[in-house]
Regions:
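Cytosolic-facing regulatory segments adjacent to core modules
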Residues: 1-55, 70, 169-170
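A generic structural signal for short, non-catalytic loop/turn and secondary-structure boundary residues
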Residues: 28-29, 130, 151, 164
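P-loop NTPase motor core
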Residues: 35-156, 176-179
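Low-complexity, intrinsically disordered Gly/Pro/Thr-rich segments
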Residues: 154-157, 166-168
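A generic structural motif
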Residues: 159-161
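NTP-binding/hydrolysis catalytic cores, primarily Walker-type P-loop NTPases
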Residues: 163-184
Length: 184
């Protein structure tokens, strides 16, 4: 964590801030990445994070919350998802782990004029909004216009940020290379 406010990520104002952002990016880039593609339960995720946290701070990317298995078949989808999100939040706190949890949004935003998703559009449970430290949502205006380009302009909407500001960060997305870059 660079501790640099998000407003300075696009245009750092000091050499120290630039250096911190570069060092933070390198630290993430040098992490070992392990992909687990089989279906997981909350218990297996917890076990894996405990193992990985022995090596230091862990980043866990979970795609997506609806695929996490549950042993309790009597719960509704809402109750199941709420319980999973609460458990992931507790794992994050207990093991100093950063968890990136992918969730779906409902289609309400597609019916609005600007089509940008809002936190209230998150599917299955309000617990996603409640438990999250940060909520990021992607928006591609060209998708709704039916325009395909090699380099797309993608907005990352920071809908919630307990430790900083909310707002929009615009990135360039190169579809061919599957790469995001800061615009400009």
């Amino acid at each position: 964590n660079t501790k640099i406010p998000i407003v300075y990520h696009d245009n750092p104002v000091t050499e120290y801030q630039k250096e911190q952002l570069i060092n933070g990016s390198r630290a993430i880039a040098n992490k070992k990445i392990k992909v687990i593609s089989r279906s997981q339960t909350i218990s297996s995720i917890r076990k894996r994070i405990i193992e990985e946290s022995k090596q230091g701070h862990t980043l866990a990317f979970i795609d997506y919350v609806g695929l996490i298995g549950s042993n309790d078949k009597t719960k509704s989808l809402y109750e199941k998802t709420t319980a999973i999100v609460k458990e992931l939040r507790q794992i994050s706190l207990d093991y100093d782990c950063t968890i990136f949890l992918v969730a779906q949004i409902n289609r309400n935003s597609e019916n609005t004029k600007d089509k940008r998703p809002k936190i209230s559009d998150l599917k299955e449970t309000g617990e996603l909004e409640q438990s999250a430290t940060t909520v990021l949502m992607l928006h591609n205006e060209n998708y709704y216009k039916g325009i395909e380009m090699k380099i797309e302009e993608i907005e990352i909407i920071i809908g919630k940020n307990r430790n900083g500001q909310t707002g929009i960060l615009t990135l360039e997305y190169n579809q061919q290379n599957q790469r995001f870059d800061i615009k400009g």
